[in-house]
Amino acid sequence: MNIIKVKVVYALPDIQYIKEVHIDSNSTVKDAILASNLLNTVKNIQFYKNNVGIYNKLVHLNENVKNGDRIEIYRNLIIDPKERRRKRSNICLKK
């Protein structure tokens, strides 16, 4: 059994949670997230609803992780990016 080191990351607008965990080399993304204890630290993570990725590439929870991976838990969008740009440009035009 080999032990690897990965980081699990969850970012909010005002704070980032970064947990480094040591897990078995046969572990999955789900195993790493559970080992990080972020689900208990940050209450608004909806484990099975949020998308996850490794270095900005979407992956499934059952994907195997490698040493040095950065597992990212993504937040749901609050507002559509196109709508936000539209609102911002309207504000700038009014000034």
UniProtKB/Swiss-Prot annotation:
- One Pfam family this chain carries? Ub-RnfH
Q: Which domain of life is it from?
A: Bacteria
InterPro entries documented for this protein: Mopterin_synth/thiamin_S_b (IPR016155), RnfH (IPR005346), RnfH_sf (IPR037021)
Q: Which residues form a coiled coil?
A: none
Which HAMAP family does this UniProt record tie to the protein? UPF0125_RnfH
Query: Hey, which family's this protein in?
Result: Belongs to the UPF0125 (RnfH) family.
Name listed for the protein in its UniProt record: UPF0125 protein BUsg_244
- The source organism is Buchnera aphidicola subsp. Schizaphis graminum (strain Sg)
